[in-house]
Amino acid sequence: MTDAVLRMLLATSKVMDVHLLTSSPLRDGLAAELTERYGIKTHLVELSEGNNPLRYIEYNKYVRTRIEECHPHIVHVHGSWDVKAAIVQRCARKMKLVTIVSPHRGLSPEIIDIDFWKSRLWKMLLYQIQMISRCTAVAAMNDKEREDVLGLGLKRRIEVMPAMTGQNSGELCAALTETYRKALDSSYRLFLLDDETKFLEATVRTAIADDDVKTEIPSLNGLSFRRISFLAFDEDATEIMKRGAEKAGMYLPQEIDVANLPRYKNKHAKTLRSLEEMSKTINVNHIPEEQREERRAVQMIVQAWTMGKKRMTLRNWAELYDLFRNRDFNEDIVGNELRHRRLKRFTKRLQKDLKSRFALKEGYVIFQ
């Protein structure tokens, strides 16, 4: 692989507003087709020459400056065993951008074995391992390259794009666009705006609160409903969002079938379990009828403690908000039981979060 084989795709949040930064001119017709069919505009970046380490420091500053100028969302790096390509990938990752790496057969056993002890080993330890393991996904040219990367045990998110080796620019454009969209959709939280999170939380609060409670829902103008849809799906709150928007008389764009869109598996995905349903599994037949609501309230808070706040979905928070806001139970009985279980401090933290996210009022809390 030569130093010139490096490309960066710079994508904005819009589907058809994409910028491609490449170190060498694209072949005839490809740049024009990218622009006409997919709205991808191409730009050229010059790579520094030579292997002087001081030039790498200078190049690192150049890459950061270039990325700050273009405000990309995706950086696509082509090549292996190139420290400058690794610099681009590292800078993009530190700036919280989606990164795609195309090794171009550079990680095959035949290539790795060449001068392994003299050069490949230290290059592997210094930057090549991090370049592959910490990127968003790897774009392989064929199934063999995919197996080579899998064999190294560094990455499981691997896309096979045979079109990269062909001459059909249409197939290449379609394959690249599909891969970039999948990577963007999988990493949507990197670009999530505060107003988009507030929009979802406001619709949830509107769905649960009484009609006399007025909630100001942010306008969708300037927001990405696609990202909001992904967030609602991952937080198990899609139906609550739609119910809240309907209650507020707000028109939502056409529903996105998030479940069937291609995305990478999130290893940090939250547990999609309902606190209400888990609390109902507790046998309350031996408890007097007048105390069952208190027992279920305690069990919901216990289940929230067991799950952990970081693993709770927005639906779980909505269930807790509904518990504090709308359920009719004796706060003294519930409070004494939570003290007995040593959950007073945890409950007070829940109340604080509910006040911040859903504007829960003081009159509805268990512990003042």
Regions found by a protein language model. Give the residues of each.
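Conserved NTP-donor binding/palm subdomain of two-metal-ion nucleotidyltransferases/polymerases, i.e.
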Residues: 180-368
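A short, active-site helix/loop in glycosyltransferases that binds the activated sugar's phosphate group
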Residues: 26, 133-157
